[in-house]
Structures are given as C-alpha cells and as structure tokens.
Amino acid sequence: MDPYKVIIRPVVTEKAVAMIENENKLTFIVDRRATKQDIKRAVEAMFDVKVEKVNTLITMRGEKKAYVKLKPEYSASEIAARIGLF
C-alpha cells in the first residue's frame, strides 16, 4: 500500500501525548486493511525513522488505531513536533 494512504491521521489525546513523552510511541489512525508490516513501512518511509514494533486495535468506532514504538535512537517527540502535534 502507498504510505500516504496507510496513515490517515495522528491521534492527539492525553494518553497519546503521554506515550510520546514516556514510551517513545506515536499513535495513528490507519487504513483498516493495513497490516502491521504496511504500517511499519509507511512510518519509516514518511518520517525517516526505524520502527521497533507496531501494536494495532480496532476502536469502537470501527477505525484501526496503531501504536508505533520507535527505536531508542529516534525521538517520538521530534517527530511529533515535525508533524505539528506540539
């Protein structure tokens, strides 16, 4: 899948911001058909980082949410600032 079609939007909630600061994780709403590998490739291509792991879930609204943990040498805070979350 095209990286720009996989990631729909970032999630900006208290929990998501806490995860950026404490756990080096970014949270996105993604295409429901995207696999964890698709999400990993999309984040790595769009933000020029390395991804350690991806956790996904389907929300009550029927959207797919992805928690993307970055490798320790990359900062989720810097990426969040670059995409305008802070």
Swiss-Prot record:
GO terms for molecular function: rRNA binding; structural constituent of ribosome. Part of the 50S ribosomal subunit. Contacts protein L29. GO terms for cellular component: ribonucleoprotein complex; ribosome. Binds to 23S rRNA. One of the proteins that surrounds the polypeptide exit tunnel on the outside of the ribosome. Belongs to the universal ribosomal protein uL23 family. It comes from Thermococcus onnurineus (strain NA1). This is Large ribosomal subunit protein uL23. PANTHER family: 60S RIBOSOMAL PROTEIN L23A (PTHR11620).
